[in-house]
Curated annotation (Swiss-Prot):
Belongs to the YabA family. Involved in control of chromosome replication initiation. Inhibits the cooperative binding of DnaA to the oriC region, thus negatively regulating initiation of chromosome replication. Inhibits the ability of DnaA-ATP to form a helix on DNA; does not disassemble preformed DnaA-DNA helices. Decreases the residence time of DnaA on the chromosome at its binding sites (oriC, replication forks and promoter-binding sites). Tethers DnaA to the replication machinery via the DNA polymerase beta sliding clamp subunit (dnaN). Homotetramer. Interacts with both DnaA and DnaN, acting as a bridge between these two proteins. It is found in: Cytoplasm, Nucleoid. Its main location: cytoplasm. GO terms for biological process: DNA replication. It comes from the Bacteria. This is Replication initiation control protein YabA. Signal peptide: none annotated. It comes from Streptococcus pyogenes serotype M3 (strain ATCC BAA-595 / MGAS315). Keywords: Cytoplasm, DNA replication, DNA replication inhibitor, Metal-binding, Zinc. The lineage of its organism: Bacteria, Bacillati, Bacillota, Bacilli, Lactobacillales. The gene is yabA.
Length: 107
């Protein structure tokens, strides 16, 4: 390999390094932008979770009887008595129980 070919090889290698360095800098900027966006989204997500938790707590505090009624309806729909007379016993053939219905129909 003569001096000119060697110089041309080094020049080509140098140009390739410059192109690669420019690509790395562009990737670095993109990663930095993504990290910033990720941080912003994490903060927003945390705030939204706190807000949701606060709203759920307020809702539960305002209407605990609604949750209890929903829970009792769920048990009844699964085929169990919720009345004082037969509480916890399975309803045969999912027949209606007037005592259970009376509890569910109360306001």
């Amino acid at each position: 390999m003569n001096k000119k070919e060697l110089f041309d090889a080094f020049d080509g290698f140098s140009q390739n390094l410059m192109v690669t360095l420019a690509e790395i800098e562009a990737m670095k900027k993109q990663v930095q932008s993504l990290v910033e966006e990720n941080t912003i989204l994490r903060l927003e997500n945390t705030k939204l979770r706190e807000r949701l938790s606060h709203l759920e707590h307020e809702t539960a505090a305002k209407n605990p009887s609604k949750q209890r009624k929903d829970h009792l309806e769920g048990i009844y729909d699964e085929g169990f008595h919720i009345c004082n007379f037969f509480y916890g016993q399975r309803r045969e053939n999912d027949e209606e129980c007037m005592f259970c219905r009376e509890l569910l129909d109360r306001k």
